[in-house]
């Protein structure tokens, strides 16, 4: 499976789950098809196929041409994948993810959280914990200050990875190579 194909299927899965993946695969194989044909090929209900096709269209991953049947007067929509802009779409999605992660990091670093210790229960901000008298609103246990340093480190790591992928930050490996090259040049000049 090509990298482009894998990225397309990942985006399809984000958009509409396994059903969207099946529709994209069917469109790749067939090239162009109506929603009814795709429903027949995949075994997915026509309404669901249409919903997914419109979601793919909204993401600019699918397009259609409308053809009128002269006998019936009905319009048929022939759908096809539109992957020319896939790199641009992937970049835009990564930028949105980066902004979301930065917002989460801001929230994690600007708040003090409290938690009862049960992983299924929510962590609460100081104000929320104060409101509940520092007892868990679900189980009644005493709330303790929540150590979110691991969460913060994971967010920082993921942000750095995305920034490197997007070319917004130089790769640490590239930095080392540049430094070594500069050191060699300085040594040669002496």
UniProtKB/Swiss-Prot annotation:
One Gene Ontology term of the molecular function aspect: DNA binding
Q: Which PROSITE patterns match?
A: HTH_TFE_IIE
> Locations of Basic residues compositional bias?
174-190
Top-rank taxon: Archaea
SMART domains from the xrefs? TFIIE
Stored Pfam families: TFIIE_alpha
Q: Name one GO biological process term.
A: transcription initiation at RNA polymerase II promoter
Region Disordered, as annotated, extends over 170-190
Q: Which residues form the HTH TFE/IIEalpha-type domain?
A: 4-87
Q: Which UniProt keywords apply?
A: DNA-binding, Transcription, Transcription regulation
Q: What residues form the membrane-spanning segments?
A: none
Which InterPro entries does this UniProt record tie to the protein? Answer: TF_E_archaea, TFE, TFIIE/TFIIEa_HTH, TFIIE_asu, TFIIEa/SarR/Rpc3_HTH_dom, WH-like_DNA-bd_sf, WH_DNA-bd_sf
Q: Does the keyword Transcription apply?
A: yes
This protein's domain notes: The winged helix domain is involved in binding to DNA in the preinitiation complex.
Quaternary assembly: Monomer. Interaction with RNA polymerase subunits RpoF and RpoE is necessary for Tfe stimulatory transcription activity. Able to interact with Tbp and RNA polymerase in the absence of DNA promoter. Interacts both with the preinitiation and elongation complexes.
Biological role: Transcription factor that plays a role in the activation of archaeal genes transcribed by RNA polymerase. Facilitates transcription initiation by enhancing TATA-box recognition by TATA-box-binding protein (Tbp), and transcription factor B (Tfb) and RNA polymerase recruitment. Not absolutely required for transcription in vitro, but particularly important in cases where Tbp or Tfb function is not optimal. It dynamically alters the nucleic acid-binding properties of RNA polymerases by stabilizing the initiation complex and destabilizing elongation complexes.
**What family is it from?**
Belongs to the TFE family.
Protein name (Swiss-Prot/TrEMBL)? Transcription factor E
């Amino acid at each position: 499976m090509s990298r482009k194909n894998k990225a397309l299927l990942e985006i399809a899965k984000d958009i509409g789950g396994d059903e969207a993946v099946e529709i994209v695969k069917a469109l790749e194989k067939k090239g162009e098809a109506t929603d009814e044909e795709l429903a027949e090929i995949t075994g997915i209900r026509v309404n669901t196929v249409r919903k997914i096709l419109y979601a793919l269209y909204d993401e600019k991953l699918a397009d259609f041409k409308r053809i009128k049947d002269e006998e019936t007067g009905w319009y048929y929509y022939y759908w096809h994948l539109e992957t020319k802009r896939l790199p641009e779409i992937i970049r835009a999605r990564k930028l949105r993810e980066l902004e979301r992660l930065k917002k989460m990091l801001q929230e994690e670093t600007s708040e003090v959280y409290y938690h009862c210790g049960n992983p299924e229960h929510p962590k609460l901000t100081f104000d929320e914990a104060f409101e509940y008298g520092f007892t868990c609103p679900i189980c009644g246990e005493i709330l303790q200050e929540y150590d979110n340093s691991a969460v913060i480190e994971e967010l920082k790591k993921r942000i750095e990875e995305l920034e490197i992928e997007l070319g917004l930050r130089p790769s640490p490996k590239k930095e080392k190579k540049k430094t070594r090259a500069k050191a060699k040049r300085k040594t040669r000049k002496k």
